[in-house]
Amino acid sequence: MEVRAMVREVRVSPQKARMVIDVIRGKPLRDALAVLQVLPQKTAPIALKLLRSAAANAEHNYDLDPDRLYVKRIYVDEGPRYKRWQPHARGRVGRKWRRTSHITVILDELPEKGAPRG
């Protein structure tokens, strides 16, 4: 049973968010949470909260055991960009883009050992 959670319009550029997200893809939930707690990047606490939310959804809505969950898919999409202005010399302005991200995680149960595949 797949469980999905998503956070939208996070004020982190997608490129920087993907650096953190790539570290936890495919890991068991317990390991992914442990890794995110020690990463210094701005995206780490956001992803940590998202994983905890997905685990709570799995436990509450589908009666799944959080100890048997793993990160099946996690990806970052680009959100809207906001234009902001940066003052320059001689009364001119430069354009700055404030980038945002949408982060989606899909958790699934670990397959049982010895269970037939297919």
UniProtKB/Swiss-Prot annotation:
Gene Ontology cellular-component annotations: cytosolic large ribosomal subunit
Cysteines joined through disulfide linkages: none
Pfam families xref list: Ribosomal_L22
Entry annotated with the keyword Isomerase: no
UniProt record, GO biological process: translation
Listed GO MF terms: rRNA binding; structural constituent of ribosome
Alphabetically ordered keywords of this record: Ribonucleoprotein, Ribosomal protein, RNA-binding, rRNA-binding
Quaternary structure (record): Part of the 50S ribosomal subunit.
PANTHER family: CHLOROPLAST 50S RIBOSOMAL PROTEIN L22-RELATED, LARGE RIBOSOMAL SUBUNIT PROTEIN UL22M
Record's function text: This protein binds specifically to 23S rRNA; its binding is stimulated by other ribosomal proteins, e.g. L4, L17, and L20. It is important during the early stages of 50S assembly. It makes multiple contacts with different domains of the 23S rRNA in the assembled 50S subunit and ribosome.
Family per record: Belongs to the universal ribosomal protein uL22 family.
Annotated protein name in UniProt: Large ribosomal subunit protein uL22
Organism: Thermomicrobium roseum (strain ATCC 27502 / DSM 5159 / P-2)
Taxonomic lineage: Bacteria, Pseudomonadati, Thermomicrobiota, Thermomicrobia, Thermomicrobiales
Gene: rplV
